[in-house]
């Protein structure tokens, strides 16, 4: 099974694998600053006891009814990177602000055990599709539950909003599955399933408006008195969660930082302590890093806004809890722009807000032109503009627009965690977790720009500094259970990271299955990541290492060439029950390796191409052929 990943346009990882696709907003960090700096940013609350009481109140308010006699609505979302959650939150807010007599409650599918469907009447489902057409990782137990338990949902009226990406196979598959399952269990669809390609807020808003228009017309629903059953069940569920997780990340100390490469592209190895976090991972998982925006860029933005850095704004309800104490109700403008919002990836709605507030006629005409074809993905001019302009560029370009700061912040995307494949094994070291990261720097509109997370770690963190982390499980990229099973790993360039973890794990546990590793890069003396370690593993007989250096000879050599040179060996590995893993570029490398494998099978197993493709598909279904790839 493959996990296909879209990279944010300005983020390149040497830690291969899981990275962000959409604008995730609910993952949280403790401040990577000292107490004094925390006071400067407004992190440290003057009255911890009062804040603790406020936190308890806030948690209770999640399922406290606004009035005693309302019709409850369940909004159920499944998300991998947060977009479904963001849409679900907006739908919840729209229903609760516009529809009198109705009350929307929002639940992540990972909390499905607290739901009593026999007590629900209207269910609105929002889910993304991950990887090779599978549900989001944390939503999978819910999908399995529905498959194993044929519920009677004949009393429920429902609608599904399916999120996907047309560039991948199995478009919106998870949403289609839930739509079909609810129908088969007797639920009545009051709005046909809507499928949305990527982050198209025009479509999202249209769906929200449609639902808000249809819900009051539904028959057969009744208002409910008394406390909602979810009130107590949600509190019990919260108590069952681990000490640290994506909703309360661990503030980890940087232990080691060293450069892995030479030349113009810099790659670094990082090690973070796990301490008493109780965080656990297995090879194939990713580490999420919650970065800060660069202080210089934040200062420049505040200067353009003509506001004080210490200007107080409301703390976003989704903002992560910083440390053991709850967040204060207000934080500084510096804090919110440093920790909360993505100042590189701007949304179309920001331009609409500026257009509504702009004073200069030329600026207004430019904004009008950009928005002439709407704010959806079909407006290619707008999409291209936003891809090439950060918040600082936009504020400079439309300097006469001065919308209220709260309105401007409301149109910014949330700052995402960055995901890096883990390059270590807990079987070898339980006290730390390792990554390798490419330091991203590039030119845009005459100024040097940097990747948010990579430069946060490379340039702004020293050994001893802290950053917030959590583990992101990747169940579709796992070592075989049988320690004698041979494995084939193809990880050119950035794809090496999880295979370092694989090798360390098999070594520590004494696995006897053969380990074949194919690695490729430009030059052996510039970007051969972990070259000494891999060559030592090879010399010790732990792995069989095959390298391809594309720029060392006049004829470029890639991992595909090395695979072809060892065709019979690869067929023997498949016939022996071996597992195949590919990690790296999804646009060219992974498809080319797939076709190379098909060619090898066709030639050496004496079958035609269709049968070779069918065999590879069978291996995928059996989880003997797994991909962790990204664009």
Curated annotation (Swiss-Prot):
Please give the InterPro entries that the UniProt record associates with this protein. CysJ-like_FAD-binding, FAD-bd_FR_type, Flavdoxin-like, Flavodoxin/NO_synth, Flavoprot_Pyr_Nucl_cyt_Rdtase, Flavoprotein-like_sf, FNR_nucleotide-bd, NADPH_Cyt_P450_Rdtase_alpha
Q: Which GO terms describe its cellular component?
A: cytosol
Q: Which cofactor does it need?
A: FAD; FMN
Q: How is the cofactor bound?
A: Binds 1 FAD per subunit.
Query: Which CDD domains does the UniProt record give?
Result: SiR (cd06199)
Disruption-associated phenotype: Cells develop only to the mound stage and accumulate a bright yellow pigment.
User: FAD-binding FR-type domain: from which residue to which, for each copy?
Assistant: 247-480
What EC number(s) does the entry state?
A: 1.6.-.-
State the protein's name. NADPH oxidoreductase A
Q: Report the gene name.
A: redA
């Amino acid at each position: 099974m493959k996990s296909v990943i879209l990279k944010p346009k300005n983020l390149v990882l040497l830690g291969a694998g899981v990275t962000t696709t959409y604008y995730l907003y609910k993952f949280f960090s403790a401040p990577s600053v000292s107490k004094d700096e925390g006071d400067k940013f407004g992190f440290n609350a003057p009255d911890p006891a009062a804040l603790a009481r406020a936190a308890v109140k806030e948690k209770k308010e999640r399922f406290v009814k606004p009035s005693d006699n309302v019709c409850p609505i369940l909004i159920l979302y499944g998300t991998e990177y947060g977009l479904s959650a963001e849409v679900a939150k907006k739908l919840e807010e729209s229903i609760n602000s516009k529809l009198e007599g109705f009350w929307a409650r929002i639940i992540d599918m990972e909390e499905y055990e607290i739901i009593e469907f026999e007590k629900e009447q209207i269910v609105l489902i929002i889910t993304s599709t991950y990887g090779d057409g599978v549900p989001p990782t944390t939503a999978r137990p819910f999908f399995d539950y529905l498959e194993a338990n044929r519920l009677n949902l004949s009393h429920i009226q429902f609608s599904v909003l399916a999120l996907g990406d047309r560039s991948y196979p199995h478009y919106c598959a998870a949403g289609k599955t839930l739509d079909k399952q609810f129908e088969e269990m007797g639920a009545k669809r009051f709005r046909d399933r809507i499928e949305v390609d990527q982050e198209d807020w025009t479509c999202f808003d249209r769906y929200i408006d449609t639902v808000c228009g249809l819900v009051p017309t539904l028959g057969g629903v009744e208002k409910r008195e008394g406390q909602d059953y979810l009130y107590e069940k949600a509190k019990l569920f919260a108590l069952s969660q681990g000490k640290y997780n994506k909703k309360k990340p661990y503030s980890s100390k940087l232990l080691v930082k060293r450069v892995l490469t030479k030349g113009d592209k810099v790659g670094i190895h990082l090690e973070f302590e796990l301490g008493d976090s109780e965080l656990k991972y297995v090879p194939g998982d990713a580490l999420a890093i919650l970065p800060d925006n660069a202080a210089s860029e934040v200062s420049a933005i505040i200067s353009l806004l003509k506001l004080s850095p210490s200007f107080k704004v409301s703390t976003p309800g989704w903002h992560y809890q910083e440390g053991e104490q709850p967040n204060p109700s207000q934080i500084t403008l510096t804090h919110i722009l440093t920790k909360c919002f993505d100042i590189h990836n701007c949304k179309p709605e920001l331009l609409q807000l500026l257009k509504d507030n702009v004073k200069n006629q030329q600026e207004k005409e430019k904004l009008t032109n950009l928005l002439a074809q709407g704010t959806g993905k079909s407006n290619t001019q707008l999409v291209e503009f936003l891809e090439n302009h950060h918040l600082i560029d936009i504020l400079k370009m439309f300097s006469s627009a001065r919308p209220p700061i709260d309105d401007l912040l409301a149109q910014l995307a949330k700052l995402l965690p960055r995901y890096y494949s883990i390059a270590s094994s807990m079987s070898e070291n339980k006290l730390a977790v390792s990554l390798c990261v490419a330091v991203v720097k590039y030119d845009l509109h005459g100024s040097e720009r940097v990747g948010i997370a990579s430069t946060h770690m490379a340039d702004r963190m020293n050994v001893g500094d802290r950053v917030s982390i959590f583990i992101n499980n990747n169940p579709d990229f796992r070592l075989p259970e049988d320690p004698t099973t041979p494995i084939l790993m193809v990880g050119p360039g950035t794809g090496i990271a999880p295979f370092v973890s694989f090798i360390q794990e098999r070594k520590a546990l004494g696995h006897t299955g053969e380990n074949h590793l194919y690695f490729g890069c430009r030059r052996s003396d510039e970007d051969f990541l972990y070259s000494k370690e891999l060559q030592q593993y090879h010399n010790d007989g732990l792995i069989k290492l095959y390298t391809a250096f594309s720029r060392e000879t006049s004829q470029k050599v890639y991992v595909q060439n090395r695979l072809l040179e060892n065709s019979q060996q690869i067929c023997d590995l498949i016939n022996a029950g071996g597992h195949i893993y590919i990690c790296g570029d999804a646009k060219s490398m992974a498809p080319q390796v797939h076709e190379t494998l098909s060619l090898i099978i066709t030639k050496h197993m004496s079958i035609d191409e269709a049968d070779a493709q069918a065999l590879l598909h069978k291996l995928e279904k059996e989880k003997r052929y797994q991909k962790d790839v990204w664009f």
